[in-house]
C-alpha cells in the first residue's frame, strides 16, 4: 500500500512552494474560474496550521476581512495555485495556532517575527 501511495505522489506535478511554517504570513495567488472567465485572486494571511505530507499536504491560512475572521484550507499541490510568497516569517512556539481565533483586532494576526538569514 505504501508503495502505491509513493508511486501516485511521484507522478503528481509539484508546485514550487517555499517552506511554510505556522506563524508565517503568506500571499497566495489562486486561479478562480467564474463562468468562462479566469482570474487571479490573492489570499493573504497567517498560516495557522499545516497538515499531511507529500501530495496531500494542506495549510490553513487565516485573515481578518472587514472585522470578520476568514480561514481557508489550501492544498499545497493544487493546480489552482499560481504562486506562494512568504511575506514574513513568524516565530511560533506551537504547531497549531488555533488560539489566534479567539483574538480580535490587530492581536488576531500578531505573531513574533523570526529572523531568517538569506544565503546567496
From Swiss-Prot:
Keywords: Ribonucleoprotein, Ribosomal protein
GO BP, sorted A to Z: translation
One Gene Ontology CC term in the entry: cytosolic large ribosomal subunit
PROSITE patterns: RIBOSOMAL_L19
Organism superkingdom: Bacteria
Keyword Ribosomal protein: yes
Molecular-function annotations in GO: structural constituent of ribosome
Transmembrane regions: none
Pfam families: Ribosomal_L19
HAMAP family from the UniProt entry: Ribosomal_bL19 (MF_00402)
Family in the record: Belongs to the bacterial ribosomal protein bL19 family.
Protein purpose: This protein is located at the 30S-50S ribosomal subunit interface and may play a role in the structure and function of the aminoacyl-tRNA binding site.
The name this protein goes by in its record: Large ribosomal subunit protein bL19
Annotated organism of origin: Chlorobium luteolum (strain DSM 273 / BCRC 81028 / 2530)
